[in-house]
Amino acid sequence: LVGSEMCIRDRLYSEGYTAVINTTINSKGSATYNNAVMAAEEFYSVHPEAKGKFTIYNIDGESYSGAYGYAVVQGAMKATKDVPAADIVAFMEDWIKNCVIFFAPYTLKYAKKSGRIPSAAAFVGEVMGLRPIMRIHDHAIVTETKVRGDKAIVPKILDLTVKEMIPQTPYCIVYGNDESVRD
């Protein structure tokens, strides 16, 4: 990873770019962010003349692509409009800092396998029809609440989302492709 990032940064620098913005997955769940920081340090050790001419911004996504993806797309759109890199980074970091994800598994099978839910709790939850509503924010995944039955999931997520929304700011509501549970 570090080597491939070096090649990209070398190429961008040699082509005259003045900045690169790199957004990575949650630094507490992956070493990608720390590797990117090390790659930036290595780039400047190889190219000391680049300091002050070529800025490498590494942004910790603090979550997963479903959360920071919007900021990345918006940042790319801003870049095509010649918005300064520092302003793009400020926008992206603000979005990431304020972004909260709510989701719920329709089966506890995978949550049990991953260790997020103990086996006994998963068994009882399946028998009783309990579904955890999970919250991802600031590097952490926690169980926000539980609902009984699949049909209660979406209304509860919408309720929680409305409570988290900051007025007059963009938001995204995303659902999977199983239309039988969407409706």
Which residues fall in each region the model found?
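Active-site microenvironments of hydrolase-like enzyme catalytic domains
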Residues: 23-27
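Short, small-residue-biased leader/transition segments that mark boundaries at the very start
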Residues: 1-8
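Mixed-charge interfacial surface used for oligomerization/domain docking
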Residues: 28-32, 36-41, 45, 51-57, ...
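Short, well-structured alpha-helical segments in soluble
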Residues: 9-15
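Structural motif
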Residues: 19-21
